[in-house]
Amino acid sequence: QMCIRDRENIDLALIQLKNKKTPENTYIFKLKGDDSERSFTDKLATLFSSSDDDKLKIDQQLYMIGYNAGLVLANTKQGIKVQMTSGKVTQLSDGQRLLYSIPTLQGSSGSPVIDEYGNLVAVNFAKLGTTDNFNFGIPEESIKEFMRK
């Protein structure tokens, strides 16, 4: 793999596989208006809504899909299993971060945070102090800007 974009002040990287092929047995999130002819970054951009009706609101339900604590929790007798946790928006985005009450453990950075319709609204990146119930995500507007550069 090769990093094609990164930024020091945002815990986010855009990577591209050298062979440009998705590994087998990998789940790909469906994108709104999926069109196989469009580029990957164009497809990523469709994850984000631009209508005022789609703006996040305080107390709106959010979900995070990931591997809290890595293999410690994910490794089961039936194999590696993902966890889905939920919480609510507790502070609206300031353009750099979105605060929500989704519980996380170490290993959750990079997990997608989605709304009730499956739209990506943030990428999880930090905890607030020692609590596991207030966490920050990189909001969609920062991700869009990151992808444009």
Regions found by a protein language model. Give the residues of each.
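Short, acidic, Ser/Thr-enriched surface-loop or helix-capping motifs
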Residues: 115
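Flexible, gly/ser-rich surface segments that form the specificity/activation loops bordering the active-site cleft
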Residues: 42-98, 104-108, 124-136
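C-terminal cap/linker of serine protease catalytic domains
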Residues: 1, 22-41, 68-71, 80, ...
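Small beta-barrel nucleic-acid-binding modules, principally OB-folds
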Residues: 99-100, 148
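A short, hydrophobic, proline-anchored segment that marks a local hinge/packing element in signaling
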Residues: 110-112
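Conserved active-site neighborhood of the chymotrypsin/trypsin-like protease fold
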Residues: 1, 5-58, 65, 70-73, ...
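Short conserved active-site loop signatures built around small residues
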Residues: 118
